Structures are given as structure tokens and as C-alpha cells.
Amino acid sequence: MARKGLIEREKKRKKLEQKYHSIRGSSKKEIRKVPSLSDKWEIHGKLQSPPRNSAPVRLHRRCFLTGRPRANYRDFGLSGHVLREMVQACLLPGATRSSW
């Protein structure tokens, strides 16, 4: 189980990312359109003004049961060991264990 503080920090980052998403997107489009290098540097400075935690790169996918940030399966939103336990307990319909 992940610490509650880390999970809350992740929620805060997600809110910040949603808040500044349009600003970052518009700045990136402007950089692509502007031909002169000096104007690109100016727009790049604007792109650096939002907080660091508003960058989408800083977000992690977490298991929604345990909060574990690693070994997540996107299709299920679960970490690997939780997914395996749920499949063994037949809690995920349609998922089967491989056997050969």
C-alpha cells in the first residue's frame, strides 16, 4: 500500500496538469508556427512559467486499489500482483491464466 501523502500529491499534480493543459498546448502550437528563433525563445520562456508539477510528464499511473506506481496494466488500472490475485480469484470476467 502506498503512503497516503504520495497518493494525495499525485491527485494535486493531476489537478494542476488539467488547469495548465490549455496554456501548455497553445504555447507549443505557437512555437511550431513562429519562424524566427528569437520569438521561439520568448514563447519558450512563457512555457516555463507554469509550475513544474503541472507538466504531464510528472504524472504516474497508479494502481487504484493499492496506489502502487509500478507494474501497472493500463487495461485494468491494476498493478501486476493485484491483477494476478484477482484473476486467480475469478474476480475479473473474461481474464484467464495462461496454461500450456
From Swiss-Prot:
Any one GO biological process: translation
Main location: plastid
PROSITE patterns named among the record's database cross-references: RIBOSOMAL_S14
Keyword RNA-binding among record annotations: yes
Domain of life: Eukaryota
A single Gene Ontology CC term: small ribosomal subunit
Compartments where located: Plastid, Chloroplast
Region (Disordered): 1-29
Pfam families referenced in this protein's UniProt entry, alphabetically: Ribosomal_S14
Keyword annotations of the record: Chloroplast, Plastid, Ribonucleoprotein, Ribosomal protein, RNA-binding, rRNA-binding
Basic and acidic residues bias: start-end ranges: 1-10
An MF annotation (GO) of this entry: structural constituent of ribosome
Subunit structure: Part of the 30S ribosomal subunit.
Known function: Binds 16S rRNA, required for the assembly of 30S particles.
NCBIfam families according to UniProt: PRK08881.1
Family: Belongs to the universal ribosomal protein uS14 family.
Protein name: Small ribosomal subunit protein uS14c
Species name: Acorus calamus (Sweet flag)
Gene this chain is encoded by: rps14
